[in-house]
Amino acid sequence: ILCYVTMVDGQVKEMGDYYIDGVAFPAEEILLEFAEPVDPSEELFPTGNLVDDLEVPGIGTFKATMITAGIPTIFLNAADIGYKGTELQADINSDTEALARFEKIRSYGALKMGLISDLSEAETRQHTPKIAFVAPKSDFTTSSGKEVKADEIDLHVRALSMQKLHHAMMGTASVAIGVAACVEGTLVNLAAGGGEKSAVEFGHPSGTLKVGAVIKKENGKYIVDKATMSRSARIIMKGEV
């Protein structure tokens, strides 16, 4: 990971006006470049397809993009699972049936991605894959009550982590979003309007985030040179003697 950090008189510049939705206060922007965010021994799309039909007994068959960049992630269309893509935590985390449905879909996705060899292993592999759903852009209201207009974003993304809808978006999942958005034909790319892209701004429960990627195709294989996103500088701990 390459971090571009602003320095002043040999010290990190912490104060700034860059604001990440979901973080309590603004700070100096730090640009991150995730060099080769896909393990060379792994396929970016482990099934070999940009979009698969994911069969989940008792629930249905869903179009899914399964990707390993950043963190293994399963992307679904929000409309296919009965959502708009503008949902907040309270809309999903209090619905035990919905959470169980997401977990079953995630388990079958893990099996199809080759991350597990038996469905029973999914219970002890909660960290990956993540499951997320996407939708075309529209006006929405964040968890803090902020109004975001459709023309401020390219698409909506909501993601679950450890069987709960995340309050914003996980950093590693943001890498997956950025890479998937920049590959023509994935569900993420199509939700953002399709076509060639180098970056997208997506809406999440706490606001918006811009992510991107540099990708090339060699001998039929997608190669991710880097994924990009910004974070903010902030003091985690300070001690004085």
Question: Across the structure, where does each feature detected by a protein language model lie?
Answer:
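Non-transmembrane, aqueous-exposed alpha-helical and coiled segments at domain scale
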Residues: 1-241
